[in-house]
């Protein structure tokens, strides 16, 4: 028993030496807080946006400026100098630190200095991403199609599905659904996107309301995953429900806010959340574009989230485009 106790103490001591405890930055002392779930990280981003929520007429540019105030350091090593970070966090699932700054310019300067201090460590400003204008414009017509199809469902369900989404028929998904009519299993598909229209009749019995969530910075909670503006997530989830048997449920993971903005970090949180809540499949038909000014290796964070998902046995489906 004594040996086990000593071994535990030694292991704990080694872990504590790796995790950051505090940093001193330009006269500031910043305690490092541990964040153990994607929801906890989302809450930090939500609090960061507090002043923005009080403003009227918040734009996508405003949201993107807030995102650029964050710096990601992919290391558990204690930082001797954060160059002015007002808050420092360590996300245990992803194994990286999140530094918050008063301005995007301060964050950019900090990245330059931190890269000099820690060569070989992946350090970058959080990356704003936006839903493509083409996707947003096209979804207005898609929503009309969905609504028309739902109203005609009583006439002929199979015919309606094909009329609403020709792609389902082209890919043979309508036949697959018919072949699976006697399937006795179940599955949950996490749709990481702009949310979902929770009141749409197609989702009445197909939505996993317990685990659907909003991780976007404009709201929190299980009841905030509704998609009132964009429609893209509703479109994607509609295709899933109409191409699969009733045993397949949708877990709506909202990562885009009302302006159509998200961050690379928030999207990776969506992947972690889906894995932690036992999604069988993750769907990311996001149709977003990375704004200019970022290096290609900044996307490693997403690759690492995918690796965690695959290790957990979760299937990840990512769209490459609509062509």
How would you name each of these model-derived features?
Residues 105, 127-131, 194-198, 246, ...:
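Solvent-exposed loop/turn segments at secondary-structure junctions
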Residues 18-29:
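Sec-dependent signal peptide cleavage junction
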Residues 10-18:
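Hydrophobic core
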Residues 154-250, 269, 276-277, 281, ...:
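Active-site core segment of subtilase-fold serine proteases
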Residues 1-7:
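Positively charged n-region of N-terminal signal peptides that target proteins for export
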Residues 124, 251, 315-317:
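Structural detector of well-ordered beta-strand residues that form the stable sheet scaffold
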Residues 256-323:
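Substrate-binding/access-modulating region of protease and related hydrolase catalytic domains
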Residues 14, 61-63, 77-167, 178-179:
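Autoinhibitory propeptides
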């Amino acid at each position: 028993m004594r040996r086990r106790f000593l071994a535990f103490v030694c292991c704990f001591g080694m872990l504590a030496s790796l995790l950051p405890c505090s940093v001193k930055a330009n006269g500031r002392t910043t305690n490092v807080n541990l964040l153990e779930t994607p929801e906890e990280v989302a809450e930090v981003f939500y609090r960061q946006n507090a002043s923005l929520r009080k403003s009227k007429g918040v734009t996508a540019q405003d949201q993107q400026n807030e995102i650029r105030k964050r710096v990601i350091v992919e290391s558990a090593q204690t930082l001797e100098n954060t160059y002015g970070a007002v808050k420092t966090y360590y996300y245990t699932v992803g194994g990286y630190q999140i530094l918050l700054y008063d301005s995007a310019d301060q964050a950019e300067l900090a990245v330059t200095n931190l890269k000099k201090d820690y060569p070989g460590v992946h350090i970058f400003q959080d990356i704003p991403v936006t839903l493509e204008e083409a996707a947003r414009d096209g979804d207005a017509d898609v929503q009309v199609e969905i609504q028309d199809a739902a109203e005609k469902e009583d006439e002929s369900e199979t015919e309606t599905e094909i009329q609403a989404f020709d792609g389902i028929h082209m890919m043979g998904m309508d036949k697959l659904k018919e072949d699976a009519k006697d399937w006795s299993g179940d599955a949950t598909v996490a749709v990481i996107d702009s949310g979902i229209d929770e009141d749409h009749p197609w989702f009445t019995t197909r939505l996993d309301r317990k685990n659907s969530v909003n991780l976007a910075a404009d709201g929190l909670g299980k009841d905030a995953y509704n998609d009132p503006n964009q429609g893209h997530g509703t479109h994607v989830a509609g295709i899933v429900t109409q191409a699969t048997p009733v045993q397949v449920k949708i877990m709506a993971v909202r990562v885009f806010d009302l302006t159509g903005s998200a961050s690379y970090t928030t999207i990776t949180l969506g992947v972690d959340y889906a894995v932690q809540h036992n999604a069988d499949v993750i769907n990311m038909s996001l149709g977003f574009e990375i704004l200019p000014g970022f290096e290609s290796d900044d996307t490693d964070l997403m690759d690492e989230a995918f690796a965690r998902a695959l290790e957990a046995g979760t299937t990840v489906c990512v769209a490459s485009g609509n062509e």
